Amino acid sequence: MTKFIFVTGGVVSSIGKGIVAASLGRLLKSRGYSVSILKLDPYINIDPGTMSPFQHGEVFVTQDGAETDLDLGHYERFTDTSMSRLNCVTTGSIYQAVINKERRGDYNGGTVQVIPHITNEIKERILRVAKSTNPSVVITEIGGTVGDIESLPFLEAIRQFRKEVGRQHVLYMHVTLVPWIASAGEMKTKPTQHSVKELRSIGIQPDILVCRSDRPLPKGLKQKLSGFCDVPEECVITSQDAKSIYEVPLNLEREGMAEQVLNLLQMEQRQPDLTQWQTLVQRLHTPKHELEIAIVGKYVQLSDAYLSVVEALNHAAISTYGKLRLRWVNSEDLENESAETHLGGVDGVVVPGGFGVRGVDGKIAAIKYARDRQIPFLGLCLGMQCSVIEWARNIGGLTDANSAEFDPHTTNPVINLLPGQQEVVDLGGTMRLGLYPCRVLPDTLAFKLYQEDVIYERHRHRYEFNNAYRDLLLKSGYAISGTSPDGQLVEIVELPKHPFFLACQFHPEFQSRPSSPHPLFKGFIQAAIALSLSTSTTPTPLEVS
């Protein structure tokens, strides 16, 4: 039978529950167990798809087209397992489902209440994940902090869950903060004690305490927490701050977390195989090259808005023994100041996705700078659209070229709405979302990187390359290297005579893994390293037959 682990958080938000859940998933998978990880988010939005990146960070898109919390990216990257729309549940989606059932008459005229109707729906969503892929373990992260009113229905549901599926099949893990108070010269356990007290008042006794701190917990302090929180000493786990999130699974393995989890759930103890992960961390700490990459975006004030892009760059850099430094560039700054001021000296430029006209001219200026200066360039989604506009304006002779998104009345809409999008009114869940095939054309940089005729990538967009301008741009030297299987949708463009200039309509960052960096990011980083090592101001272009 599937086992269930529930991860809650206390004391402060953003304490790292998602990384703990993902790390535990990795440790279990290294022992041969299959894992699925579920996020229960307490906000009332149906999904994060329409939420501001400044508030919520990036929207992570699953293969089946769900717009989900960024933590699902951590789950996929750490466990190397693709999640689905079943793995992200919000309060809004729960209430929507219950209200729809009430409208259909499913409750036979009964009074619809938080208990049992909302809690039953939550439990059903958890069981649905277990039934869908039949994993050995389902790990469920409860968003928010214990004590928040928004989380109460979720906590009540997981309290009931243990009784219904059996105590031996359920484990509660509580992630909390043990701060170091410099003025006192000691670590304080009181916040954790109060957090556990709050959790116990709801009816949940944690089986394992994961204590986030900036230093190891002394044995005496673990004994103290064990006594006050009624948790065995060996189940008080230190989660010490790390320079990289990829160190966390190894740190938790040294603390014996997986061993205790298997003991408590009465599962077979198996020898872990973490060789691949250890190699990853070893490469992380022994770089041979240093390079600086500029990310030119609209939401750079919150780096989480581009989390998967950053991680994909890290994966590629680690695989090539590169030490990555990021230069965050607000695209709006490039509209009033020279590109040289903000991009001078970088080894590569990434223009990621986004929506709306704000800052677009700055993105276009960054792309022109990278093209003119022969600096490796990678455009993602909106980044591809901006690269098409830049080329059309400056090389194709269409000085007023634009996207219909930015100027609905432009005379040269080189980027236009996808077919079927003209009548769409709602914003949420209505774009081209999820995994789609792409035909990679031979004798192109894209084919050299992928080494495959057909690839599958995740999409999240409403606008596309306008085929009315295809011949014009091709004649001016622009190259199309990837299309939909029917050839109608342009998916990848590139410049053959540039060291590395490639842009794609999809989001390759969602498919990158620490153990298998995405080919586009790896090729981009290799080109950036070549530039950083070059003594010439004009690097030699990559050869494409």
Swiss-Prot record:
| Any one GO molecular function term | identical protein binding
Q: What binding partners and quaternary form does the record give?
A: Homotetramer.
Report which reactions are catalysed by this protein. Answer: UTP + L-glutamine + ATP + H2O = CTP + L-glutamate + ADP + phosphate + 2 H(+); L-glutamine + H2O = L-glutamate + NH4(+); UTP + NH4(+) + ATP = CTP + ADP + phosphate + 2 H(+)
What is the gene called?
Answer: pyrG
Q: Which UniProt keywords apply?
A: ATP-binding, Glutamine amidotransferase, Ligase, Magnesium, Metal-binding, Nucleotide-binding, Pyrimidine biosynthesis
Q: Where does ATP bind?
A: S14, I15, G16, K17, G18, I19, D71
Can you give the residue ranges of the Glutamine amidotransferase type-1 domain? 292-534
Q: In which pathway does it act?
A: Pyrimidine metabolism; CTP biosynthesis via de novo pathway; CTP from UDP: step 2/2
Residues binding CTP: S13, D148, I149, E150, K188, T189, K190, P191, T192, Q193, K224
Judged by the first EC level, this protein's enzyme class is: ligase
Q: Tell me which family the UniProt entry assigns to this protein.
A: Belongs to the CTP synthase family.
Q: How is its activity regulated?
A: Allosterically activated by GTP, when glutamine is the substrate; GTP has no effect on the reaction when ammonia is the substrate. The allosteric effector GTP functions by stabilizing the protein conformation that binds the tetrahedral intermediate(s) formed during glutamine hydrolysis. Inhibited by the product CTP, via allosteric rather than competitive inhibition.
Q: Which GO terms describe its cellular component?
A: cytosol
Species per Swiss-Prot/TrEMBL record: Nostoc punctiforme (strain ATCC 29133 / PCC 73102)
A Gene Ontology biological process in which this protein takes part is: 'de novo' CTP biosynthetic process
Q: Relay the record's extra comment.
A: CTPSs have evolved a hybrid strategy for distinguishing between UTP and CTP. The overlapping regions of the product feedback inhibitory and substrate sites recognize a common feature in both compounds, the triphosphate moiety. To differentiate isosteric substrate and product pyrimidine rings, an additional pocket far from the expected kinase/ligase catalytic site, specifically recognizes the cytosine and ribose portions of the product inhibitor.
Stated EC number for the protein is 6.3.4.2
- Name the residues annotated as catalytic in the UniProt entry: C381, H507, E509
Matching InterPro entries: Class_I_gatase-like (IPR029062), CTP_synthase (IPR004468), CTP_synthase_N (IPR017456), GATASE (IPR017926), GATase1_CTP_Synthase (IPR033828), P-loop_NTPase (IPR027417)
- The protein's name in its UniProt record: CTP synthase
Residues holding Mg(2+): D71, E141
- Top-level taxonomic group: Bacteria
Residues annotated for UTP binding in this entry: S13, K188, T189, K190, P191, T192, Q193, K224
Pfam families given in the database record: CTP_synth_N, GATase
Region labeled Amidoligase domain — which residues? 1-267
Q: What residues bind L-glutamine, as annotated?
A: G354, L382, G383, M384, Q385, E405, R462
